[in-house]
């Protein structure tokens, strides 16, 4: 187990009358990844940051005094000032507001359990409810383990959400780096600095609903289930066992209740390890082991960002909005190097779905490469994952004339039982329940690296997304598709907007084959179709045709079995 982290804090005792001095609690930081370096002040107690020449009030510990501070060249100059009660309420959660006597700055004296400029931060919140829109806790770590950036950082000034917005307090944003969900995404998130730039990432904040589950989310910090066996099959020791005297994480820990420890032997993760664990006796020796608690599925969850650029046939997109999208490359026998072949869909750690017609050349498996987590088709992504192919399975009844049974499975090669590692840009899509029947004209999404239009000689350089609607079966017939065969294993979807010859209708196109058609179902993006074929690209009143995934669930599961 990791040793308990300990921190030391130096407190400066301020004595005597009013005079200015540099604060020992506030240090200079130089932010990275910007065009120029900027010195700022950071309060180590509150984690608040202040720009050059910015002023603020702060209470003095163990005193009724209030100080006025000013950030000057990375050092805070502070002195005591007289205050009075605020003329209007500005503090939440029972906080007491005091305003400087001679200027408008104010400070809130917060009750126990609350912090922040306006006492808006709930320091006791350990998990989030629903989507976490109302979450006001102090979790500040992203799923990748990166530390969140302060919402007031000048590096975020041009981002859509920062602590400088007029409605920042209402959204939970401010001078802190805690996870929030200001845009009603699927869960709390924050900005992190990675690979020389700031980008948004979901947080590892535990969901309150996962506490009593039979599985765990993230690393299982909030797991409160009743599993009590380790991966080796050993029984966990009671957390209050006398054998554990001297250990840090026991039922005697001062924070035992908050950590989920007590008079039981259930698996827990009190120290933020990789997953739930417990103490065990092995060969008469006290040790610890990870537990056999399964990880909860996060299929179909994503960090969706609104596309900024409209292009022919759809919209440019980021891979984080479609983290199940795969790019399949092939080495052809008669040409050097790898070439983009088709799209694919991540449905489990080691399995990719695609279209059967992509593999009509019968490539040897070692000539295929699958890339996950890539926004630009031929430009490596910062967090992409690349795999060789162990084998691929094309449906035995695939008809290369009608494209009936246009489905294939690729198994990724790995030295372990796991292949793709879940991240904000790599995640599985949910397979549909067998009885899923979505209403006609349901709006869904497709994604891929295909051409912008049918006559284009080039594939898209960047991932695209398109929004289409499911056609009723009465409109998905040969009569509507120039007498091409439309089998029961197919479904149709298209852009139903009206428009003239110049209308930019969304649709799949050459190169998108094998990619996903996903629809929202029970709060998760669910795979409904596999991009298969069509007549042209983006033709008015002409839908695209997709392999109907619900018809192949047994085939998928049978072929994925060891």
Curated annotation (Swiss-Prot):
An example molecular function term from Gene Ontology annotations: serine-type endopeptidase activity
Domain of life: Eukaryota
Any single Gene Ontology cellular-component annotation: extracellular space
Signal peptide: 1-20
InterPro entries listed in its UniProt record: EGF-like_dom, Fibronectin_type1, Kringle, Kringle-like, Kringle_CS, Kringle_sf, Peptidase_S1_PA, Peptidase_S1_PA_chymotrypsin
Enzyme Commission code: 3.4.21.68
Subcellular locations according to the entry: Secreted, Extracellular space
Keyword field: Cleavage on pair of basic residues, Disulfide bond, EGF-like domain, Glycoprotein, Hydrolase, Kringle, Plasminogen activation, Protease, Repeat, Secreted, Serine protease, Signal, Zymogen
Purpose of the protein: Converts the abundant, but inactive, zymogen plasminogen to plasmin by hydrolyzing a single Arg-Val bond in plasminogen. By controlling plasmin-mediated proteolysis, it plays an important role in tissue remodeling and degradation, in cell migration and many other physiopathological events. During oocyte activation, plays a role in cortical granule reaction in the zona reaction, which contributes to the block to polyspermy.
Name used for this protein in its record: Tissue-type plasminogen activator
Annotated source species: Pongo abelii
């Amino acid at each position: 187990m990791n040793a308990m982290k300990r921190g030391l804090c130096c407190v400066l005792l301020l004595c005597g009358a009013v005079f200015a001095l540099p604060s020992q609690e506030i240090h200079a930081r130089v932010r990275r990844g910007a065009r120029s370096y900027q010195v700022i002040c950071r309060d180590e107690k509150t984690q608040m940051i202040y720009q050059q020449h910015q002023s603020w009030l702060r209470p003095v510990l163990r005193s009724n005094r209030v100080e006025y501070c000013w950030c000057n060249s990375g050092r805070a100059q502070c002195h005591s000032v007289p205050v009075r009660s605020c003329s209007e309420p500005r503090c939440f959660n029972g906080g007491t507001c005091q305003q400087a006597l001679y200027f408008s700055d104010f400070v809130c004296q917060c009750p126990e359990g609350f912090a922040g400029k306006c006492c808006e931060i709930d320091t006791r919140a350990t998990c989030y409810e629903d989507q976490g829109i109302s979450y006001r806790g102090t979790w500040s770590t992203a799923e990748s383990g990166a530390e969140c950036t302060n919402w007031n950082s000048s590096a975020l000034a041009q981002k859509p959400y920062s602590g400088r917005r007029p409605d920042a307090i209402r959204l939970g944003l401010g001078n802190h780096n805690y996870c929030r969900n200001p845009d009603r995404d699927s869960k709390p998130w924050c900005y992190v600095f990675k690979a020389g730039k700031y980008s948004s990432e979901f947080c590892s904040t535990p969901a309150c609903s996962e506490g009593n589950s039979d599985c765990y989310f993230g690393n299982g910090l909030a797991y409160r289930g009743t599993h009590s066996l380790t991966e080796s099959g050993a029984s966990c020791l009671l957390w209050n066992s006398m054998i554990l005297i001297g250990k840090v994480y026991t039922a005697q820990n001062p924070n035992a209740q908050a950590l989920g420890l007590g008079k039981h032997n259930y698996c827990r993760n009190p120290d933020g390890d990789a997953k739930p664990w417990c103490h065990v006796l092995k060969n008469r020796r006290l040790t610890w082991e990870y537990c056999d608690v399964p990880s909860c599925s996060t299929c179909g969850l994503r960090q969706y960002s609104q596309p900024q650029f409209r292009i022919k046939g759809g919209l440019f997109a980021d891979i984080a909005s479609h983290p199940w999208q795969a790019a399949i490359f092939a080495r052809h026998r008669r040409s050097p190097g790898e070439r983009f072949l088709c799209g694919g869909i991540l449905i489990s750690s080691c399995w990719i779905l695609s279209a059967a017609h992509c593999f009509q050349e019968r490539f040897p498996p070692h000539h295929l490469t699958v890339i996950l987590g890539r926004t630009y088709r031929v430009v490596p992504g910062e967090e992409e994952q690349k795999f060789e192919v162990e084998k691929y399975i094309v449906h035995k009844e695939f008809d290369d004339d009608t494209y009936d049974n246009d489905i294939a499975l690729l198994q990724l090669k790995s030295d372990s039982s796991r292949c793709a590692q879940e991240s904000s840009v790599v995640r599985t899509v949910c397979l549909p329940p067998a009885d899923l029947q979505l209403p006609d004209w349901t709006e869904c999404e497709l994604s891929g690296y295909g051409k912008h239009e049918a006559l284009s000689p080039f594939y898209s350089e960047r991932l695209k997304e398109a929004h289409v609607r499911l056609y009723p079966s009465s409109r998905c017939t040969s009569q509507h598709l120039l007498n091409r065969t439309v089998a029961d294993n197919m479904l149709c979807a298209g852009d139903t907007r009206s428009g003239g010859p110049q209308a930019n209708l969304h649709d799949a196109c050459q190169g998108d084959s094998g990619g996903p058609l996903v629809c929202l179902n029970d709060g998760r993006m669910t795979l409904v179709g596999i991009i298969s074929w069509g007549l042209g690209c983006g033709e008015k009143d002409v839908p695209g045709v997709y392999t109907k995934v619900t018809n192949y669930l047994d085939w998928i599961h049978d072929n994925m079995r060891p």
